[in-house]
């Protein structure tokens, strides 16, 4: 029972410490949300669908 207060204090100290990144950020670090890869992928897929003459709803497209 003597260890319980010590355990509680340690847990409170751990919870109150600020989170720190494992590695420092560099000027080249970009958050994933700022990438436009999904827009580019959609544009490329739309171009491929148009080249293959697929239906508008893409149900007749056979990718393979």
Curated annotation (Swiss-Prot):
Signal peptide extent: 1-22
Isoleucine amide carried by residues: 63
Alphabetized UniProt keyword annotations: Amidation, Disulfide bond, Neurotoxin, Secreted, Signal, Toxin
Expression tissues: Expressed by the venom duct.
GO cellular component: extracellular region
UniProt keyword Secreted, yes or no: yes
Protein name (record): Conotoxin Ts-011
């Amino acid at each position: 029972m003597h260890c319980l207060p010590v355990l509680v204090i340690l847990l409170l100290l751990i919870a109150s410490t600020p989170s720190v990144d494992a590695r420092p950020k560099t000027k080249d670090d970009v958050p994933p949300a700022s990438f436009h890869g999904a827009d580019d992928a959609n544009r490329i897929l739309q171009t491929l669908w148009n080249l293959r003459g697929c239906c508008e709803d893409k149900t007749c497209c056979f990718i393979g």
